[in-house]
């Protein structure tokens, strides 16, 4: 409400590190609160919040690799939504490491990067 954050669904290129790194990811959903990170090609620097939706056949190793990559880049919040198990894994950055919590699709989940935003998964059709 009244903030500068914007939501960008895939396809949307994110260059996680502002240096010469060639690491580019394409999260399912990126939330960016700093408009200075936006370019005509996508985003340069870590989004504030990334949501990935697990596709059947996706490797859990991919989730772990991205988890470490996103923590190193400074992504403040990372959610993995698994429609098959009906679980949401929420990782909230504390200093340089993620604090992890898990929820079901029957729960209301606080978005940690905002003071007053909750997502009620019971209300969503997934």
Named regions from a protein language model:
Residues 2-73, 80-126:
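C-terminal interaction segment
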């Amino acid at each position: 409400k009244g903030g500068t954050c914007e939501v960008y669904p895939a396809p949307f290129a994110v260059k996680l590190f502002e240096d010469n790194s060639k690491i580019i990811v394409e999260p399912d959903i990126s939330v960016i609160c700093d408009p200075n990170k936006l370019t005509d090609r996508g985003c340069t620097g870590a989004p504030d919040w990334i949501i990935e939706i697990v596709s059947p056949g996706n490797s859990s190793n991919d989730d772990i690799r991205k988890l470490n990559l996103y923590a190193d880049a400074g992504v403040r919040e990372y959610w993995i939504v698994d429609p098959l198990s009906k679980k949401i894994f929420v990782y909230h950055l504390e200093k340089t490491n993620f604090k992890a919590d898990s929820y079901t699709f029957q729960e209301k989940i606080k978005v940690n990067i905002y003071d007053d935003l909750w997502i009620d998964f019971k209300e969503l059709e997934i």
